[in-house]
Amino acid sequence: MSDMRRLMILFLLVGLAVVLSGCATLSVHSKVNKDGSVESYKLVINTSSFVYGLLAEGAKKEGYESLRESFLSEIPEEMRDKVSYDEVWSGDQVSIIIEARDYVPADDDKVKIRKENGFLIYEDLSFASENNQTSSNELGNALLSSFSLHYYLEMPGKIVESNANVVKDNKAEWHLTGASAFNTRIYAKSEVPGIPGFEAALAIVGLLAAGLLFGRVKG
């Protein structure tokens, strides 16, 4: 299992713990580079101080001083310089912010990026159940009814195909609630921008080559 996949599983476990403990909103902000690497993948969990207290209490029972320490202890050592953890408080509400930066998804990661026929294809299967069906369990649906997922994706080029709720230029948004948030495959297909100035450089090289060829013929 790749380090990034382990980290993604950890992200989801934290999010799931919050969901099962009470109402919550989960936001994902993902930004992709034109070479297919991920510039940043940020997870923001917004919940109440009560739910946070339950999670912190669970962490202390496991021998950790805080929820932060509990989370950071699970991150592979080679990934620690690429991952940050922050908490932002506002009255009775808290935002848990976890971000990974500058990594290339492995083949077994939930986040998959590939180049195909001149396009860049992005998929995130983190929120797609294996059978892709909404649970019929009444208790499960009740627990998830207060859950919201907001996913924001920024691709390096214009998005030409996606299952997002909103698409504008190189950005896409998904806004999901309840059990449907865990039955969704995040998908987008974008153009791959050229290297700035590359076309101009080719034109200059072409003109120089033509000039040399013309000079030789004339000579």
UniProtKB/Swiss-Prot annotation:
It is found in: Cell membrane. The keyword Manganese does not apply. The keyword Transmembrane helix applies. Keywords: Cell membrane, Membrane, Transmembrane, Transmembrane helix. One of its GO terms (cellular component) is plasma membrane. The chain crosses the membrane at residues 8-28, 194-214. It comes from the Archaea. Disulfide bonds: none annotated. It is a multi-pass membrane protein. This is Uncharacterized protein AF_1487.
